[in-house]
Amino acid sequence: MVWEVKSNQMPDAVQKLLLVMDKRAPGVSDSLQLLQCKETLPSSPGYNSCDEHMELDDLPELQAVQSDPTPSAIYQLSSDVSHQEYPRPSWNQNTSEISENTYRENEVDWLTELANIATSPQSPLMQCSFYNRSSPVHIIATSKSLHSYARPPPVASSKGEPAFPHHWKEQTPVRHERANSESESGIFCMSSLSDDDDLGWCNSWPSTAWHCFLKGTRLCFHKGSNKEWQNVEDFARTEGCDNEEDLQMGTHKDYGSDGLKLLSHEESVSFGESVLKLTFDPGTVEDGLLTVECKLDHPFYVKNKGWSSFYPSLTVVQHGIPCCEIHIGDVCLPPGHPDAINFDDSGVFDTFKSYDFTPMDSSAVYVLSSMARQRRASLSCGGPGGQDFERSGFSKNCGSPGSSQLSSSSLYAKAVKTHSSGTVSATSPNKCKRPMNAFMLFAKKYRVEYTQMYPGKDNRAISVILGDRWKKMKNEERRMYTLEAKALAEEQKRLNPDCWKRKRTNSGSQQH
């Protein structure tokens, strides 16, 4: 039995529903007789009744609903992940003759694509509880304004003092408040910041508490009245006071105003967590040196280099900032410094365009970058938008074998050199070593320490001890090694896709 819904034109132009019941088709079992309705209901006055038609007068009158002719933005997540960047007619013989200038006017760059994906309903950023704010989000980005950190300095005051120390003082309360709600979330989220609207890029990045140091960093000055370890938040709060007593005691308002030069670095354990112990030189003898303890993924903006870190793979996962490797002698700049400007599409931006991510981690940068990468891959392979892809700016970003390829290759080469273990063996181009997993990275880091703790034990016994220590570690402690192993594995898999395939050398497989 088939039920249909038909509309019947009434004299008063009111549509009503008519339920039409078809007769039972031949061959249908008699057990379906109960489904047939043989009762004839009285129809409305003035209309003829029929055995096959039933008019239901108690149904509400139907009213035509005017649909909005303008299509809404639809974000579909499929094998060819895409989003609606701007209205564009589908390709046919008529639209193929449209000039390229029409499309170039609506071109969007790599950052805008990520921004559009980030604001889609499927984006994990839209599901953040702290994202729902009253003020709108303004996203107008270019490679020249990659981060709000690398901004031109504000207008200098009339007193002739440097502009950037004054800038820290004014922005410290706002940035500190933002760090509590966003940096602790563990993902790369976007926010609506009224004080950054004029920058053209309102992407919140991990906020500095003082100078170039993030929340959670510990400071120890080698000179001055206070040589004890102190949290950077407490120090910044003290520096924000304008008491005359503090000024007479000698504060550090202009400390390292031209940047901090890295003198030494080492890894240590503080409060049960692996940290970096760094020593900086402010450039003036009277100020003295500074030693800090920060997290392994702490990013620094280095003069003439851009964003840098000791563990770039961890930094890009935790903060969403692709970095170069930092070295001894690099000068770390504070926010607002005249040299802290993203200069001419630096290697950091090229690394960001060439870095390969997977949505294996809950971090939003993995998800968004993977969505954009899948879309670019589908378009470059001759998809429905292949011709539009060639017109856009992504073709030159992804197809140029220039600095983006070199930057990622150099980072990978350094990572392999740093994390390689065992005897060095000559590897041919056709044979590559598999990257180390999380436990191997952990064992490499602490093998020397455990060997000194247990003298007389061979390498196998030390491995057993390390394995027991690994099993007792918490998931939070393992996460650092897991993320680093993922980043190294994905980068090596991208550069050497065949290294994951075990080739058979027997005669049976060679006959295929």
UniProtKB/Swiss-Prot annotation:
Regions of compositional bias (Basic and acidic residues) in chain numbering: 167-180
The AXH domain, residue ranges: 201-343
InterPro entries: Ataxin_AXH_dom, Ataxin_AXH_dom_sf, HBP1, HMG_box_dom, HMG_box_dom_sf
Post-translational modification: Ubiquitinated by the CTLH E3 ubiquitin-protein ligase complex, leading to subsequent proteasomal degradation.
Presence of keyword Membrane: no
Keywords of this entry: DNA-binding, Nucleus, Repressor, Transcription, Transcription regulation, Ubl conjugation, Wnt signaling pathway
Location(s) in or outside the cell: Nucleus
GO MF term (any one): RNA polymerase II cis-regulatory region sequence-specific DNA binding
Record carries keyword Ubl conjugation: yes
SUPFAM superfamilies recorded: AXH domain, HMG-box
DNA-binding feature ranges: 432-500
GO cellular component, one term: nucleus
GO biological process: regulation of transcription by RNA polymerase II; Wnt signaling pathway
Domain of life: Eukaryota
Region Disordered, annotated ranges: 151-180
Its job: Transcriptional repressor that binds to the promoter region of target genes. Plays a role in the regulation of the cell cycle and of the Wnt pathway. Binds preferentially to the sequence 5'-TTCATTCATTCA-3'. Binding to the histone H1.0 promoter is enhanced by interaction with RB1. Disrupts the interaction between DNA and TCF4.
Subunit and interaction comment: Binds TCF4. Binds RB1. Binds the second PAH repeat of SIN3A.
Name of the molecule in the record: HMG box-containing protein 1
Organism: Bos taurus
Gene this protein is translated from: HBP1
